[in-house]
C-alpha cells in the first residue's frame, strides 16, 4: 500500500509507472478503479506505461519495465519499447542504490533472461553494464556455439532451469537471503551473466583456435570494480567475484581422470558454503555451450 499523490485516486493512478500497477479498489463498494487499462493488460500478459512522461519524472521506471517482465514473463507493448528507447539516456539519473535494487529484483525473477534480451534492444543494458559491448565482440567458437553475449544470457536461463529442477534442499539453500536483502539465486544469476567478462581482454586466436587463458581470474578482478560502481556490499562482491573466479573449477574436479574423495573434500573445503552454487554455475555454463 502506498500513500496517494494528488487530490483524487484517479490522479494518483495516472502518476504510476505501469498500467498493471495503476489499479485500485474502492473498499466500500468493491469497484475496481482502472483508468489506464491495467486489467486488460494483465489478462493479455502485456507490460505498458501509464504516461511516457512518468519516465522523465523518475527514470528508474525505465528499469522497472524489465524488472516486472523478469518477474511475470509478460510481453512489452510496442509503445513502451519506443518510450524506453526515447528516454534511455536518463537511466543514470536515479541514485545508484536504487538502480542496484532494481537490478537484483530483475535477477530474482524467473524470466530474467527474457528481460535481459529485451533490455538489449533498447540500449538500457549497455548503459547499466558497459561490458556488454565487449561480450558482443566475441563470436561463436569451439568453446560456445553462441556469441559470448548470448552465451551469457543462456547461462542465466540455465541457472534458473537447474534451480527449478533441483531438490528441495538445494532450493532452500539458494533461496536463503545471506547478503544484500536478496536470495543467493538472484546473485548467482547475476554472476552467471558476468561469468565470462574476462574473455574479451584475454582473447587470442592461435592456429584458428580461440583461447581465453585465465579469463576466470581476470573476470573476477574486473567484477570487483563493476560491482563497487553499483554500490554492492562487500559480501555481495565477495560472493559474485568468487563465483566468477571459480566457475570452471567444479568442471575440472568432476572431469578429473583420477578423481578421489580427497579431491572432492578439497573442493568442499575451498568453496565452503558456495560449493553447491559453483557446481550449478559450472553446469549451467556447460549446458549453454553445446
Report residues per predicted region.
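Catalytic cores of the polymerase beta-like nucleotidyltransferase superfamily
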Residues: 1-290
Amino acid at each position: 500500500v502506498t500513500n496517494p499523490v494528488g487530490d483524487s485516486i484517479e490522479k494518483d493512478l495516472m502518476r504510476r509507472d505501469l498500467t498493471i500497477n495503476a489499479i485500485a479498489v474502492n473498499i466500500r463498494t468493491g469497484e475496481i478503479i482502472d483508468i489506464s487499462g491495467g486489467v486488460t493488460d494483465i489478462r493479455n500478459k502485456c507490460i505498458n506505461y501509464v504516461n511516457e512522461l512518468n519516465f522523465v519524472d523518475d527514470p528508474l521506471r525505465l528499469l522497472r519495465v524489465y524488472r516486472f517482465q523478469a518477474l511475470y514473463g509478460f510481453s512489452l507493448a510496442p509503445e513502451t519499447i519506443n518510450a524506453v528507447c526515447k528516454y534511455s539516456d536518463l537511466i543514470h539519473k536515479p541514485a545508484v542504490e536504487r538502480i542496484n535494487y532494481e537490478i537484483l529484483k530483475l535477477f530474482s525473477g524467473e524470466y530474467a533472461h527474457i528481460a535481459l534480451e529485451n533490455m538489449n534492444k533498447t540500449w538500457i543494458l549497455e548503459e547499466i553494464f558497459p561490458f556488454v559491448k565487449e561480450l558482443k565482440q566475441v563470436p561463436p567458437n569451439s568453446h560456445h556455439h553462441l556469441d559470448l553475449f548470448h552465451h551469457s544470457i543462456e547461462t542465466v536461463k540455465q541457472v534458473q532451469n537447474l534451480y527449478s529442477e533441483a531438490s528441495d534442499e538445494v532450493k532452500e539453500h539458494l533461496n536463503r537471503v545471506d547478503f544484500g536483502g536478496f536470495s543467493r539465486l538472484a546473485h548467482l544469476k547475476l554472476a552467471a551473466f558476468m561469468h565470462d567478462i574476462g574473455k574479451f581482454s584475454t582473447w587470442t586466436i592461435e592456429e584458428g583456435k580461440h583461447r581465453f587463458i585465465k579469463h576466470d581470474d581476470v573476470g573476477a578482478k574486473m567484477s570487483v570494480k563493476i560491482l563497487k560502481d553499483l554500490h554492492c556490499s562487500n559480501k555481495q562482491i565477495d560472493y559474485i567475484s568468487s563465483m566468477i573466479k571459480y566457475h570452471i573449477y567444479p568442471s575440472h574436479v568432476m572431469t578429473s581422470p583420477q578423481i578421489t574423495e580427497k579431491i572432492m573434500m578439497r573442493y568442499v573445503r575451498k568453496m565452503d558454503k558456495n560449493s553447491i552454487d559453483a557446481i550449478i554455475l559450472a553446469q549451467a555454463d556447460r549446458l549453454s555451450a553445446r
